Amino acid sequence: MIQGTTSDAGKSTLVAGLCRLARRTGARVAPFKPQNMALNSAVTANGGEIGRAQALQALAAGIEAHTDLNPVLLKPTGDRGAQVIIHGTARANLDARAYHDYKPTAMRAVLESYGRLRGAYDAVIVEGAGSPAEINLREGDIANMGFAEAVDCPVVLVADIDRGGVFAHLVGTLACLSDSERARVRGFVINRFRGDPALLEPGLRWLEARTGKPVLGVLPYLHGLTLDAEDMLPASARTSAARRDAGVLRIVVPALPRISNHTDFDALRAHPRVDFTYWKRGPVPDADLLILPGSKNVLADLAWLRDAGWDALIKRHLRYGGKVIGICGGMQMLGRTLADPHGVEGAAGATSAGLGLLDYATTLTPEKTLVNAAGRLAFGGDARVAGYEIHMGRTEGPALASPALMLAGRGGERPDGAVSADGQILATYLHGLFDTPHACAALLEWAGLDGAEALDYPALREASLERLADTFAEHLDLDRVFAAFA
């Protein structure tokens, strides 16, 4: 089991790289995260929902993503509550106290999934969540040492040296563990190191002498990886185009407080002719294309957009000929009204005017749509698209008569989304809209980028997984790492 001294220490990436290395040996290996809290999720082939990081790890392992890889997924709906997803299905919205009482039920689901994986694969590489040293979360823990103790799982502890204080993080984490938990830790991995490794040697010797545990590797800081993020927005809010000789498209996406599935924009951030910005505060940069992203709380995020002046900004942008895309929750915001009669996102009966840019209305419903989908753009040369839908809502209205996409359905094609009569606004429920090379190029051309190249994002992601595995093979003591899991 890979545990970390902090969130974002590198657990997900380490598991992905180890899965790819194990796959190279011919072993059948599965990633596993007992409990994940994230707003980036993926749809499995069996119609469930798991954390996006586990879908990436499944890709690294060469297996199909399924709900046993992440049996408990928590999707925050606000500062104190989350939607609880068990074995891929949404069960309830619970606040922190209610979820604490629910943990025994969640743990049973975790152990069921882990047992099935152990029986089906040669090895299971487990990822913890956050830090095992959160004293206030120790009782009833199912994500870190509570799980490791329950199944007698050895642990490797990873820490991020780029943040500073790596030795304090490692020694301090061990100090917060019980005797049996400390004994379970087989060694350390230090992540994101920059500079001369020889200068780190005195610290490594001190750490090993102080703790009696080996350092299993020091991983360098890897720039330019194209891998799906588990949850956090990228540290850099802006990426600049690598090529400017043939023109550049400027894209701005508001960093909504409850933004979900922002992996939708990874292909755009990697495109050599796109200037991409996540807007968080201050003046909004000039843009050719504004994209409203998915949201786990559409009504609250729409109110936030209005408070930030985006309703007027979008209308001004359109008057000057700009383009707008709304994806999932962003699509719902673009319509006339939003209603929450069942209290899916908050108080039952809440309603709000939408931005009023497309003639349809959305009603939030307790039933969640979870489906992988493929089809074509309904304009611009019928470029193929592939992605997934994750939403709790039904949208109806005249604007849907001019769909954005035609997706494969039972007995033929089904329409999705809408394109405005003037061709300036596109709305869709499909996540992953830009991941398919020719669809990405067609959409960038629609937004104003002449001669847009087709960027093969899946190939970039695959190359990053290979680079990750090569780096781990060079910088980890793999014999000791895999011996720790024996």
UniProtKB/Swiss-Prot annotation:
Domain of life: Bacteria
Record key words, sorted: Cobalamin biosynthesis, Glutamine amidotransferase
Pathway as given in its UniProt record: Cofactor biosynthesis; adenosylcobalamin biosynthesis
Boundaries of every GATase cobBQ-type domain copy: 248-439
Keyword Glycosyltransferase (UniProt): no
GO biological process, one term: cobalamin biosynthetic process
Active-site residues (renumbered): 328, 431
One term of GO molecular function: ABC-type vitamin B12 transporter activity
Record-linked InterPro entries: Class_I_gatase-like (IPR029062), CobQ/CobB/MinD/ParA_Nub-bd_dom (IPR002586), CobQ_GATase1 (IPR033949), CobQ_N (IPR047045), CobQ_synth (IPR004459), GATase_3 (IPR011698), P-loop_NTPase (IPR027417)
Entry's family note: Belongs to the CobB/CobQ family. CobQ subfamily.
Function: Catalyzes amidations at positions B, D, E, and G on adenosylcobyrinic A,C-diamide. NH(2) groups are provided by glutamine, and one molecule of ATP is hydrogenolyzed for each amidation.
Record-linked NCBIfam families: cobQ, PRK00784.1
UniProt-recorded name of the protein: Cobyric acid synthase
Organism of origin: Burkholderia mallei (strain ATCC 23344)
Gene from which this protein is expressed: cobQ
